[in-house]
């Protein structure tokens, strides 16, 4: 199952 990866700010 795929889950949304946490958005890491640049």
UniProtKB/Swiss-Prot annotation:
Gene Ontology biological-process entries: regulation of blood pressure
Subcellular location: Secreted
Family affiliation: Belongs to the bradykinin-potentiating peptide family.
Organism: Crotalus atrox
Domain of life: Eukaryota
Lineage: Eukaryota, Metazoa, Chordata, Craniata, Vertebrata
GO molecular function, one term: peptidase inhibitor activity
Entry protein name: Bradykinin-potentiating peptide POL-236
Cited function: This peptide acts as a hypotensive peptides, but its action is not related to angiotensin-converting enzyme (ACE) inhibition.
Chief location bin: secreted
Keywords: Hypotensive agent, Metalloenzyme inhibitor, Metalloprotease inhibitor, Protease inhibitor, Pyrrolidone carboxylic acid, Secreted
Pyrrolidone carboxylic acid: residues carrying this PTM: 1
Tissue: Expressed by the venom gland.
Listed GO CC annotations: extracellular region
């Amino acid at each position: 199952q795929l889950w949304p990866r946490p958005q890491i700010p640049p």
